[in-house]
Amino acid sequence: MIRSMTGFGSASKTQDDLSVSVELKSVNYRFKEVNARLPRPLLYFEDKLKQTILQHIQRGRIELFVSVDSDMLVEKRLEIDWPLLDEFVAAARDMKKRYQLSAEPDVMDFFKLDHVVQVHEEQTQNDKLEALIIDAAEEAVKGLCEMREKEGLLLAKDCLMHIDQLEELVRETELLAADVVSRYRERLYARIKEWTEDVLDESRLVTECAIFADRSDITEEITRLKSHFAQFRDILASGGAVGRKLDFLVQELNREANTIGSKANDHQITKLVVEMKSSIEKIKEQVQNIE
């Protein structure tokens, strides 16, 4: 199955007092990579979560977003500096006595004092939460892969359409190439007749045409193009992560088309080569999206 490298998948899971959601977005990338964004208390869990995603992906950059609605991410603990609080209380009583104040110290005011009362948060490992996140990640990556496969089918269909167009252009080029030398001979003959009244040296004309025929022969390029078309179809049919192979073939297609354009020395073939390069460029754009 051909896959695109772009896609999206998401999933949410709830169990008891735990609620998690996972989102995955993938874009084109030469290799495979996961950029994770998790709540800070879950950073220890990042590598395991990445591996869960990567085992389903061959190429592409994945953006992973995890959100958790739970009080179980951290363990909160209240700490009171009793010796320091004793000093504050003693100071409050001294102030009351010194200034003959009637009000008693408000206990809640002591909670506002720096360093007296502090809340410490400690990261905790929760197996139930981890399992829930993995479950959501598995469902999200399944949705991501399904979308990538649907887009992959469209990419493959579009590529094959352009391959069909290229094959037709190559057939037309092959037909024109068979008459390139005769057309050149006619042009050369007419040009010489225009320039001179002398009798033509037929052997010289034949020699010039032979040199031109050798220089403009595109038989090998056409044969290789046909071979590349067949390989392209076979690779698409094989499925899997074939993006790199197809990218290499596209480069070869472009190289052969350029060679034909430089060798043919015929305006009709040149027009066909321009159309070939346009189709090849469209294939290249699609192949860059294939995993």
From Swiss-Prot:
Alphabetically ordered keywords of this record: Endonuclease, Hydrolase, Nuclease
Effect upon mutating residue 258 to A: Reduced endoribonuclease activity (11.1% of wild-type)
Coiled-coil segments on the chain, per record: none
Cofactor: a divalent metal cation
Known EC number: 3.1.26.-
Endpoints of the signal sequence: none
An annotated GO BP: RNA catabolic process
Record's cofactor remark: Mn(2+) gives highest endonuclease activity in vitro, followed by Mg(2+) and to a lesser extent by Co(2+).
One Gene Ontology MF term: RNA endonuclease activity, producing 5'-phosphomonoesters
Superkingdom of source: Bacteria
InterPro entries on file: YicC-like_C, YicC-like_N, YicC/YloC-like
Pfam families registered for this protein in UniProt: YicC-like_C, YicC-like_N
Keyword Hydrolase on entry: yes
Role noted for this protein: Endonucleolytically cleaves ssRNA generating a 3'-OH and (presumably) a 5'-phosphate group. Cleaves preferentially at U residues, has no activity on dsRNA or dsDNA. Upon expression in E.coli contributes to the degradation of small RNA (sRNA) RhyB.
Subunit structure: Oligomerizes, perhaps as a hexamer. Might interact with PNPase (pnp) in E.coli.
Family: Belongs to the YicC/YloC family.
Name of the protein in its database record: Endoribonuclease YloC
Annotated organism of origin: Bacillus subtilis (strain 168)
